[in-house]
């Protein structure tokens, strides 16, 4: 199969629908915690031949969660189409098979949450205010992989950025690591060092 403008990816399992408890497997309804249990990656069967993405057959594509849940994006069996280019593309990034490097596509970026230590405080009257520990700060994140455009603007991996509310979406990658994806337009500022 030869894709022209889109990626064709093989996704063997669209949901994490099993859970191991001891020596037993529990099967989960895919609608339970649906967003948390979607698998948003697959093996590239064909990169788009009309675009020079650098991706190769066998690399791993990370994509928008709609790819495996939208009927018209399924070709057959476990093959799906992930759009590339245009407005709001499905293809987010790919991991090169040869060296494991993640390459961002379009205007998507990966970030990780910054941890905010909100230690308990004691008021003058002795009341302990439990604020919790290591709570994710929802509007600030550390850039993992910036786009080329962001690099041109001086934004690099490790920089802390502020972003618009609810712009980040949690994704679990093929190696089990958790990232948040967003579009570079959602970045409002870069903290100065």
Which role does the model predict for each range below?
Residues 1-193:
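Acidic-enriched and Gly/Ser
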